[in-house]
A protein has these predicted regions:
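Acidic-basic catalytic patches of nuclease active cores, encompassing PD-(D/E)XK
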Residues: 1-13, 26
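Structural signal for conserved beta-strand scaffold positions within catalytic alpha/beta enzyme cores
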Residues: 8-11, 34, 62-64
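Beta-rich catalytic cores
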Residues: 17
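Conserved catalytic cores of phosphodiester-cleaving nucleases, focusing on short active-site segments
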Residues: 21-23, 28-39
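Mg2+/Mn2+-dependent nuclease catalytic core
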Residues: 38-57
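Nucleic-acid nuclease catalytic cores
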Residues: 56-84
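Charged phosphate-binding loop/patch that engages nucleotide di/tri-phosphates or the phosphate backbone
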Residues: 91-115
Length: 115
């Protein structure tokens, strides 16, 4: 029995801005995930990444891990729709995520269906 979602890491130098991961779930839906590590509030994107998410607003996501001081030994995950990239550019991690932990993020990906 297959475990879903299925992940593929994308290494692409010819298509600038392409997200880091391509996922596929049990509902036969493909989606992309841009991975970010954030210190503080600001999320850094290249102009190519911004353009990608503006051109492809459906089934695209941004997963940000916020690093905390090493004394706390934990980090937090936040998942955003790719269509919210301009809010992330402007407001950073103050943007409201659609999921805030690993389990909730996995449920978003597992439950994607055709429009």
């Amino acid at each position: 029995m297959k475990q879903y979602p299925i992940w593929n890491r994308i290494e692409n130098l010819s298509l600038l801005g392409m997200p880091d991961l391509l996922g596929y779930n049990k509902n036969n839906q493909f989606f992309t995930v841009e991975l970010k590590v954030v210190k503080g509030n600001k999320v850094r994107f290249s102009p190519h990444q911004i353009a990608w998410h503006k051109r492809h607003p459906k089934n695209t996501f941004i997963l940000a891990e916020t690093l905390v001081p090493s004394s706390m030994k934990t980090s937090s995950l936040s998942l955003f729709h790719g269509s919210s990239i301009m809010s992330l550019v402007r407001y950073g991690m103050k943007t409201t995520p659609i999921a805030c932990d690993f389990v909730a993020c996995a449920l978003v990906f597992e439950n994607l269906k055709a429009p």
